[in-house]
Amino acid sequence: MRTISAQEITNTVARLCIEANTRLPADVEAALAKARQEEPWQLARNTLDLLWSNLSAAKEADLPICQDTGMACVFVELGTDVHIEGSFEAAIHEGVRRGYTDGYLRKSIVADPLRRGNTGDNTPAAITVHLVDGEGCRITVAPKGFGSENMSRILMLKPADGVEGFKKFVVDTVKLAGSNPCPPIVLGIGVGGSFDKVAYLAKKALLRPLDVPNPDPYYAQLEQELLAAINQLGIGPQGFGGRTTCLGLSIEQMPTHVAGLPVAVNVSCHVTRRASAEL
């Protein structure tokens, strides 16, 4: 049995909140760099250059890449042989509170969805814990802005809709979103499970690096086909047209009921943020 203190969790989460908001993951940065080289439309290239300049300035000045520093989505892979000394969830919330305060990150969370009073410290975080074997503890902080989150969709397709219905829903989601999610976008796509699980799968898909395809060749091929179809829409960077509408997408799947075909698309902007640490 291994013991991890609540203080260590707090310190780690605070650091990851700042890191995620000021540094793009290497895979997303590489995809943006590649798009700058390959985009054939001049206006689209100019737009990508501006996004790159903003990214570089944030890195140089250690400032947030985007003014929307997001809702702190925290994912934990926790070993079953780990004992947390202190309150686990309270430690995560305190880490978010400290990270957003010390990093001068915008406070964007309201305590109640209808009464709308701001909590003033960007808590509470949205916490997801996945139990795994062993004594490990891996924490990922993925701040999620809501310009793109609001463009996300879920649909309970009929089994008869099949793969073509699945693909159409994904592409139509991007069409409907247009320029609203600050393209070029990144998509997390979930398929299968139940109403609640498929939304989780879509969010989980955003955690997979863009250069890592689905391990199932069938879904890896679907990822390529969908990316090509989306980039033929002509929405382009910030909606100004061009070939670069989507930097990449990932599909996560799970078994489902014989009568269902749940699909969820979690839309993310070109500032798709995540930072991880092993404790």
Question: Residue locations for each model-derived region?
Answer:
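Non-transmembrane, aqueous-exposed alpha-helical and coiled segments at domain scale
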Residues: 1-189, 194-279
